[in-house]
């Protein structure tokens, strides 16, 4: 069963969370949770590439902190076939993981299809989104579309995507999108609308959620929750620490290699 038919009218805020990518750097998720945020939406990849920070860095730490989570995938697709292939890579990246929040397609102005311009290729963009989301849904996931308010109003035919929950980006005092949506991304009420969250040293997007996604997903057997409930942490703390140490060692080697290359370049330029 997919997300079709589960889209409901917006209600009161039921949970607050954040969404993250590698731009957020190191995060203390215990502090995030203590500040009242209960879920994290993690950038899992882009185009046909999974990001190492998804399963190798952020997800183990999110689980260790006891936070709910979902994931999103930046789409570079300009054809329906490309969209399906991207979604298949996303599904492969999710593997046997069981997110408690939806998994989202991310359509952006900076993407290839976004660069076509306003009202150019609107139907194709809609078809691309539908193909991506249908692929996720057919794989058993609660699929949703992340996009800005303007994108949903002008760059795709949102009515053709009404069976999928919307995660609306609008950096304002309130969300004024007229359609149904399950989550609103904003920057909070600090000066400049730059989101801040304890445990994160750089700006981060904040999110208000209007649906009890963990309950909906589990009740409908989506995202792998059709079988028995997990008995504990998917990634034990010890394994997480081992993964973190390995990642840090690789990063050190990478930084050293970059420094050596820069030294050689400087030598020959000098």
Residue ranges, per PLM feature:
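Substrate-binding cleft of extracellular glycoside hydrolase catalytic domains
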Residues: 2, 10-133, 137-140
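Aromatic-lined carbohydrate-recognition surfaces of secreted/lumenal glycan-active proteins
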Residues: 136-154
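Heptad-repeat coiled-coil/leucine-zipper oligomerization helices
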Residues: 232, 236-239, 243-246, 250-253, ...
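Short Gly/Pro-enriched loop/turn and capping motifs at secondary-structure junctions
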Residues: 110, 150-153, 171-176, 188-191, ...
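Functionally critical loop-and-helix segments that line ligand-binding/catalytic clefts
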Residues: 2-24, 30-31, 157-233, 238
